[in-house]
């Protein structure tokens, strides 16, 4: 039961993050993309930049400080690397972003969160 609630919360967070990105001028190219190396929550594009976005939803703002770490980011980066050629065309850049969400607070968008 807890897993189902967490899954639903995660999907709701991804939906909210997609809405927020669209409001900021991004197009959502894909959601929940599975790769052999992991899953990408959102793939977004604005201009010649593609962002592979990890979305984290927590019950409180305080919990957001510990929602993402280097290990999780490295998994997202590996997954993004596996599919980057499907979304970023010649001459386009890509990066790994994180969007942190909690009830009652604005989304916190960490652009270019992973730099190996």
Curated annotation (Swiss-Prot):
Transmembrane segments: none annotated. One of its GO terms (molecular function) is nucleic acid binding. It comes from the Bacteria. Coiled coil: none annotated. PANTHER family: UPF0102 PROTEIN YRAN. Belongs to the UPF0102 family. This is UPF0102 protein ELI_05985.
């Amino acid at each position: 039961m807890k897993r189902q609630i967490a899954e639903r919360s995660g999907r709701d967070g991804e939906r909210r993050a997609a809405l927020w990105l669209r409001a900021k001028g991004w197009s959502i190219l894909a959601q929940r993309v599975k790769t052999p190396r992991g899953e990408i929550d959102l793939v977004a594009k604005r201009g010649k930049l593609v962002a592979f976005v990890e979305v984290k939803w927590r019950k409180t703002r305080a919990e957001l400080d510990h929602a993402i770490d280097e290990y999780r980011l490295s998994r997202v980066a590996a997954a993004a690397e596996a599919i980057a050629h499907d979304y970023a065309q010649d001459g386009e850049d890509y990066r790994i972003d994180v969007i942190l969400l909690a009830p009652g607070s604005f989304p916190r968008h960490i652009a270019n969160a992973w730099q190996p």
